[in-house]
Amino acid sequence: MPEKRLLLLSNSINYGATFLEHATEAIKDFLGQAVTTVLFIPFAGVRFTYDAYVMRVRARFEEMGYNLESVHTMADAPQAVRQAQALVIGGGNTFHLLRSLYTTGLLEPMRQRVLDGVPYIGWSAG
């Protein structure tokens, strides 16, 4: 079984810093150059629309040199997870996230991808 690759962050913003600023180098080191596109799962976000959340996260990942796609825009979300180079889950409401993962059928494909060694980045609820 491949080694699991997890980067788990407690938060997305440190006092006096910008979004994911404190984790930029860790994310770049973790993903490396082999990953060009990450799949973002915005389902923990409840204070704003998924589109607004994606715009914020996409801007930061593009600054780091990565393309970002969002699972909420995919016609076949489980297939998108199965094909992803890396999975990124943002923070927010843990209960909303878990319910959404169950209802969209993403929990099992995500679990399998993590077991397969696909990089997983999550902060807060993610």
Can you say where each PLM-predicted feature lies in the sequence?
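Residues that form generic nucleotide/phosphate-binding pockets
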Residues: 26, 30, 100, 113
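N-terminal beta1-alpha1 cap of cysteine-dependent amidohydrolase-like domains
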Residues: 1-90
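Short, catalytically relevant binding-site loops at active-site mouths
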Residues: 46, 94-95, 126
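Catalytic-core regions built around general acid/base machinery
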Residues: 104-117
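Catalytic nucleophile loop
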Residues: 88-91, 114-126
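Glycine/threonine-rich flexible loop motifs
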Residues: 94-104
